């Protein structure tokens, strides 16, 4: 494994000790987030009014609004929490960037992404991985049902077609089935989007690709959730399972998703996330809360990802218990990866060479501040233009 390059920038809160200036900075960040989110929601409303007749164009517009939201979040993070982002991945084939010969990671167009859940900002960093894979507009996230009622954001997330669950399988099964079947059919050009000649936009970008982000642990790691997880292990006679840095994963929802998406699914990615500086005895979700990250500038200096790819034919779906044991094995390997991470400050590969050459590569980057600001400004301008067209149409 190559050692990551040194990368350190400072957020706006770290550049001044003046409380008044910091207060103005917090106000700036809040205004930027609210105005950006509002422009995205108004843009979505315009799409609903102006493009109800074209499902392809409407979906492309929704995908663009998804991209705008993750660009907005990344631009704000670049200002307040400019972490070094280190992506380490296993591959049995060379992956090349179009601009140079160095290997670079990219999610496949139709994939499920599973990860350990340490803090509430995990999903932002995973969405960023999809964004740099040119799939930022094709992300789907499974969330708590209560989140769909958040003012402004809830409306936007419902338009994003995020999946909201109540953690009651009898209630959730139908909603989950409808969402997954629709994603699968559209990806295979057999769904609602196939009333048209192509499932691709003029730029040949897949309208119906999907990156489904799931957290099998169900919640983020904390003292309370750890105690609940250990109590469940005892009740389920899983006392032999000793996870030092993770919670026991739930397999039912993941197996259901894999089965429903199997006809179109390209790969399942297992992403292990590590944050530093953090001690093995600390709970990252307590140390780096959303409030601390966005309003106080308390953030991880490094965010490390270790990514493994599983092909669908490698996943045992024939039996619930066999699938759970497979997932548990993946989680034990993740736990060892995190143990090595806390010992050495970087992920150490435990890849096995089974008749193929496994290459482990690390790439270090940031939030690419040189391109984020022009991009979000272009989104603002485009949204403002479309809103103006909408207003003029209503007046006439």
Curated annotation (Swiss-Prot):
EC number: 2.3.-.-
Pfam family, one: Acyltransf_C
Membrane topology: Multi-pass membrane protein
Domain description: The HXXXXD motif is essential for acyltransferase activity and may constitute the binding site for the phosphate moiety of the glycerol-3-phosphate.
The protein's enzyme class: transferase
Record's GO cellular component terms: endomembrane system; endoplasmic reticulum; membrane; mitochondria-associated endoplasmic reticulum membrane contact site; nucleus
CDD domains assigned to the protein according to its UniProt record, in alphabetical order: LPLAT_LCLAT1-like
UniProt GO MF annotations: acyltransferase activity; lysophosphatidic acid acyltransferase activity
Transmembrane segments: 27-47, 69-89, 123-143, 372-392
InterPro entries given in the database record: Acyltransf_C, Plipid/glycerol_acylTrfase
Keywords carried by this UniProt record: Acyltransferase, Lipid biosynthesis, Lipid metabolism, Membrane, Phospholipid biosynthesis, Phospholipid metabolism, Transferase, Transmembrane, Transmembrane helix
Locus of motif HXXXXD motif: 117-122
GO biological process per UniProt: phosphatidic acid biosynthetic process; phosphatidylethanolamine acyl-chain remodeling; phosphatidylinositol acyl-chain remodeling; phosphatidylserine acyl-chain remodeling
Name of this protein: Uncharacterized acyltransferase YDR018C
Cystine connections: none
Signal as UniProt keyword: no
Localization per record: Membrane
Family: Belongs to the 1-acyl-sn-glycerol-3-phosphate acyltransferase family.
């Amino acid at each position: 494994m190559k050692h990551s390059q040194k990368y350190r920038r400072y957020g706006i809160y770290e550049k001044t000790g003046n409380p008044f200036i910091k207060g103005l900075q917090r106000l700036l960040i809040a205004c930027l987030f609210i105005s950006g989110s509002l422009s995205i929601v108004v843009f979505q409303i315009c799409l609903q009014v102006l493009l109800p007749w074209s499902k392809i164009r409407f979906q492309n517009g929704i995908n663009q609004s998804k991209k705008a939201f993750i660009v907005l979040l990344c631009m704000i993070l670049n200002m307040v929490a400019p972490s070094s982002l280190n992506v380490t991945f296993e591959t049995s084939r060379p992956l090349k960037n179009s601009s140079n010969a160095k290997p670079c990671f990219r999610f496949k167009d139709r994939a499920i992404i599973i990860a350990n859940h340490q803090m509430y900002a995990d999903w932002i960093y995973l969405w960023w991985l999809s964004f740099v894979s040119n799939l930022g507009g094709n992300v789907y996230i499974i969330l708590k049902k209560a989140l769909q009622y958040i003012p402004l954001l809830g409306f936007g997330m419902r338009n994003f077609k995020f999946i909201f669950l109540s953690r009651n399988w009898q209630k959730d099964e139908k909603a989950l089935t409808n969402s997954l079947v629709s994603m699968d059919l559209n990806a295979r050009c057999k769904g609602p989007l196939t009333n048209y000649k192509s499932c691709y936009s003029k730029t040949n970008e897949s309208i119906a690709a999907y990156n489904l982000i799931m957290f099998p642990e169900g919640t983020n790691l904390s003292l309370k959730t750890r105690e609940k997880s250990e109590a469940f292990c005892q009740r389920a006679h899983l006392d032999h399972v000793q996870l030092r840095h993770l919670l026991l994963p739930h397999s039912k929802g993941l197996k259901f998703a894999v089965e429903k998406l199997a006809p179109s699914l390209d790969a399942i990615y297992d992403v292990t996330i590590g944050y530093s500086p953090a001690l093995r005895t600390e709970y990252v979700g307590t140390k780096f809360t959303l409030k601390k990250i966005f309003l106080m500038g308390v953030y991880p200096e490094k965010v490390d990802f270790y990514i493994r790819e599983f092909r669908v034919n490698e996943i045992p779906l024939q039996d619930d218990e066999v699938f759970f044991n497979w997932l548990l094995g993946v989680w034990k390997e993740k736990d060892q990866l995190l143990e090595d991470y806390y010992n050495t400050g970087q992920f150490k590969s435990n890849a096995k060479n089974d008749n193929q050459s496994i290459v482990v590569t690390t790439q270090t980057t940031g939030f690419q501040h040189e391109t984020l600001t022009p991009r979000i400004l272009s989104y603002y301008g485009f949204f403002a233009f479309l809103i103006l067209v909408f207003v003029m149409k209503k007046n006439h």
